[in-house]
Amino acid sequence: MTGLRWRGVAFVRWSEEAAPRTHVGGKAFQLQALTRLGMPVPRWFVLTTGATDAILGPVRGEIAALARCVEWDSESRGYAARIVACIRTSRWPAAVRAALLRAVEQLGGGRPLAVRSSAVEEDGRSGSYAGMFESRLGLPPDAVEAAVRECLAAGFAERVVAYRRERGERGAWPRLAIVIQEMATTRVAGVAFSADPRTG
């Protein structure tokens, strides 16, 4: 780890900075596209896979072992518990934490913030991972670090193991980035579907 990078990947990327999906995850990659089109996207930045890889460095072996597990049994639960404990309680690399806190301060604006998972595999061609990961909404700036920990920890939940089993996935565990974004103030909000999400 050197400066504000991990294996060449910057810890933080801002909305106006182009970055590959492997660095920022599916959600942030789509937000980049909307931002480039000039859409009115609330300001955001992403804690990249470089940052989360650095955080997860002490449990890299457990993550590789969990990726080989097919069932949610005592073995996979043990791996997941050690990973989650590391995320929730360990001291992060100082440069990662400093980069996050500095970016939260720069985001400013006084609006509540959203903390949203952005997996590299999320919303991809081979799978959506819809509903597998976590978001935390309406947060003050001083709650962001704890929310990042919870969103990252949720990436190793039983439902993710089950989703991978159902899809026959045996490869590397999904890599997570985390989006931190200003929340929009609206009078009316909704979601439009181009197809029935239950039947396609």
Residue ranges and their predicted role:
Residues 130, 194-197:
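Short intrinsically disordered coil segments
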Residues 180, 193:
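Contiguous beta-strand/loop segments that form the cofactor/metal-binding neighborhood of enzyme cores
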Residues 119, 182-184, 197:
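Short, flexible loop/turn elements at secondary-structure junctions
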Residues 1-179, 188:
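N-terminal beta-alpha lobe that positions the nucleotide/phosphoryl donor
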Residues 186-192:
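Phosphate/diphosphate-binding loops
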